[in-house]
Amino acid sequence: TCYENDNNVLPLLKQNLEYCKEKSGKKIDINIIEDNYILSQYLDFNHMIGGNDDPKKYDFVIGNPPYMKISKDAPEATAMPKVCYGAPNLYFIFASMGLFNLCENGEMVYIIPRSWTSGAYFKRFREYFLTVGKLEHIHLFVSRNKVFDKESVLQETIIIKVRKTSEKPETVTITSSKSNSDFGELTSLTVPYDLVVAGSDYYVYLVTDENEVEVLKKLHKFDKTLPAIGVKMKTGLTVDFRNRDILRDEAEEGAIPLFYSQHIKQGKVEFPIQKEHEYVVTEQKGLMQDNKNYLFVKRFTAK
């Protein structure tokens, strides 16, 4: 069974499916549903009046959903309030419906962005997705632009294998490759499930080596969050490329230091380092930090 409602794609899809059927030499029943994948099933998903109390379920679901932000008032978003909050994206709405389409203990493989693994906008989705299903395998791509190298897709993309079950597995397998053309050169890691999926927010931690696993084990031992101990984490107020007119390469009267990640070296702040745009000159309060004690965190790390 395939869902497709794009008239530009349907002829090629039908041709390819018939070709595969012929080449297989086996009896295959092909069913193409030319309908909106979400809106045609939302009554069933939400157990609403008019829905099918016993919809057809599948052993396997494979999907490469559209990556598109939609309005919170879009029909697909309002049809899936259980998983939508804030600024929804079609990809996780499709993934939710894909999991719904599975029979108990069925398996699902989706290629999707990794943005759902954290953040408030995806919390409802994670709660549903990781309660009804359980992650078994996650594949990471190191490159942002080599997975769909013929398309303008710069999302960090992952492939997930999920089983529809309430039984939590002991481990998750995490593999990684540079692109979609070197699957023969995978790095593989087996990680405890409770280390990867953790907390009341169901965050998914995508560790890639044993060092990251050890760091994560230590972090999970913390019993308080930063706000709980009176500490706030925030990004700097000044975005350089949006405020080019106030940037200065050298100190002058009224200049204020502008710190970049390059200024943090071996646990210390080194300033100046003779890089461009190390200073700003402005009277705009919204671009200046108060003169207080700060802990600088170098959050950007190399792949």
What are these regions (language model features)?
Residues 3-14, 35-225:
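Signature of N6-adenine DNA methyltransferases within the class I
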Residues 22, 150-152, 248-249, 287:
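Generic marker of residues within folded, mature protein domains
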Residues 33, 155-158, 255, 293:
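Residues that flank catalytic or metal-binding motifs in active/ligand-binding sites
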Residues 213-303:
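Polybasic, glycine- and aromatic-enriched phosphate-binding surface used to engage nucleic acids
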